[in-house]
Amino acid sequence: MNQKFEAVNAIDRNVTDVADANDR
């Protein structure tokens, strides 16, 4: 369960990074 949560967090971080790059 912790692994799944960490995977979701990693994906969320990647999505945020992509959104930030698009804003620039």
From Swiss-Prot:
It comes from the Bacteria. Induction: Expressed equally in exponential and stationary phase in rich medium (at protein level). This is Protein YljB. It comes from Escherichia coli (strain K12). The gene is yljB.
